[in-house]
């Protein structure tokens, strides 16, 4: 088996990261959000909705991943100590500030896609009250350890790539939680046009 092709792919990816870091990471995120939402819909077994996958990919590509890129750069500039002395503060600050913010950002973006100018603020508040802390607890079971490894051992250029691999499963969870209330609404209206996920907590 010729492994040179993998070397070429790796070198091309590295060069792309150096020349177009945000675009490269965002496109990688597109693949991750595609896999996460497709897996979520497969598990739900309600039929595949490509519009929802497109929506989640759009949120990931243009909203989530670019913010993570600049957030990681901010952490690297703010906490400059080597080893664990720099990694631990990054993880703590990330999990207490940016992690919760990013979840709210994701949920809000999905609701905007579903409702547009008819955005229901009461539904948004109810959703935050119901889902915010349960999802945050799930996040804290995954991301503190993951980010400890990222900030301690992984080169900054490749952190989002490694994070994206973990995110396939995590985005499956996010896709489920972000879309679940719209599934209930569509079921009540007997509208099969939007296939969404049932609650993880039910």
Swiss-Prot record:
One of its GO terms (cellular component) is cytoplasm. Keywords: Membrane, Transmembrane, Transmembrane helix. The keyword Transmembrane applies. It holds the Pfam family Mpv17_PMP22. Its main location: membrane. It is a multi-pass membrane protein. It comes from the Eukaryota. It is found in: Membrane. The chain crosses the membrane at residues 21-41, 54-72, 138-154, 161-177. Belongs to the peroxisomal membrane protein PXMP2/4 family. This is PXMP2/4 family protein 1. It comes from Dictyostelium discoideum (Social amoeba).
């Amino acid at each position: 088996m010729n492994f040179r092709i993998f070397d070429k792919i790796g070198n091309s990816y590295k060069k792309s990261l150096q020349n177009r870091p945000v675009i490269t990471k965002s496109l990688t995120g597109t693949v991750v959000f595609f896999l996460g939402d497709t897996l979520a819909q497969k598990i739900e077994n309600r039929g595949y909705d490509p519009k929802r996958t497109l929506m989640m990919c759009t949120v990931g590509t243009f909203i989530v991943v670019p913010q993570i890129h600049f957030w990681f750069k901010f952490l690297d500039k703010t906490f400059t100590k080597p080893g664990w002395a720099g990694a631990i503060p990054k993880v703590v600050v990330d999990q207490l500030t940016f992690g919760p913010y990013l979840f709210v950002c994701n949920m809000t973006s999905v609701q905007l896609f579903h409702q547009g100018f008819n955005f229901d603020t009461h539904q948004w508040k109810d959703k935050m009250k119901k889902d915010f802390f349960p999802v945050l607890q799930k996040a804290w079971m995954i991301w503190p350890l993951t980010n400890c490894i990222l900030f301690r051992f992984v080169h900054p250029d490749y952190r989002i790539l490694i994070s994206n691999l973990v995110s396939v499963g995590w985005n499956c969870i996010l896709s489920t939680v972000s879309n679940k209330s719209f599934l209930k609404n569509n079921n009540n209206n007997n509208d099969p046009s939007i296939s969404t996920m049932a609650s993880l907590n039910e």
